[in-house]
């Protein structure tokens, strides 16, 4: 990847990610509380819906930037002239991007979610308590479950986003505009969000579980089984509506803003 493309992906991805995470933070808080083992009301209800936002503010830019730099680099590295291979290349690039981005995302997500279900505690208090009780390892609790959520999500979202853009571009005989890319992103994100909600619930339960419990071990299948055993299908899809809403809106803003900022930067350089 050329330096100008690297810088464009870095800044466009980071800017888009930070905008989305901060704008849609209240919906994310509601979703997390619906998925909490304590239940919505005991986790704070509609009170303190910006609890944990400092963690997101710190982690959003580097997380999104890391994803898109890896995604664009992998796409170029795996580039093929065959149109049939394009979806596979997009899937592989997105998966690699998620593995890298989760190294930054997971510590931020752990602290954010614990603050969201304990609105009386500050982000700093949550960080201190996690480090004191579990050490650095505690910040990465749920890394595997997050990757196992993000990879299937990206395997659906990004190839679908790219395919919808290609189809729209072919229909109108020119490249899609930023707003059209955003519409494609909203549809792709919402669809992927619905399909992967059970994995998101499992990830939330693992991150919020008491240290030493079976769920806290990080075994996704065990977490899914426990949710199914105690709450059934409703438990597996807890928070699906706010998750779909947030990610659809997020896809519209995130992928539209990413395309717009990246195009502008490459045009100016």
UniProtKB/Swiss-Prot annotation:
Solcar repeats lie at residues 4-77, 85-167, 176-264. The chain crosses the membrane at residues 5-25, 49-69, 84-104, 141-161, 181-201, 237-257. It catalyses: S-adenosyl-L-homocysteine(out) + S-adenosyl-L-methionine(in) = S-adenosyl-L-homocysteine(in) + S-adenosyl-L-methionine(out). GO terms for molecular function: S-adenosyl-L-methionine transmembrane transporter activity; S-adenosyl-L-methionine:S-adenosyl-L-homocysteine antiporter activity. Gene3D superfamilies: Mitochondrial carrier domain (1.50.40.10). Pfam families: Mito_carr. Keywords: Antiport, Membrane, Mitochondrion, Mitochondrion inner membrane, Repeat, S-adenosyl-L-methionine, Transmembrane, Transmembrane helix, Transport. It is found in: Mitochondrion inner membrane. GO terms for cellular component: mitochondrial inner membrane. It comes from the Eukaryota. It is a multi-pass membrane protein. GO terms for biological process: mitochondrial S-adenosyl-L-methionine transmembrane transport; S-adenosyl-L-methionine transport. PROSITE patterns: SOLCAR. Its main location: mitochondrion. Mitochondrial S-adenosyl-L-methionine/S-adenosyl-L-homocysteine antiporter. Mediates the exchange of cytosolic S-adenosyl-L-methionine, the predominant methyl-group donor for macromolecule methylation processes, for mitochondrial S-adenosylhomocysteine(SAH), a by-product of methylation reactions. Belongs to the mitochondrial carrier (TC 2.A.29) family. PANTHER family: S-ADENOSYLMETHIONINE MITOCHONDRIAL CARRIER PROTEIN (PTHR45667). This is Mitochondrial S-adenosylmethionine carrier protein. It comes from Xenopus tropicalis. The lineage of its organism: Eukaryota, Metazoa, Chordata, Craniata, Vertebrata. The gene is slc25a26.
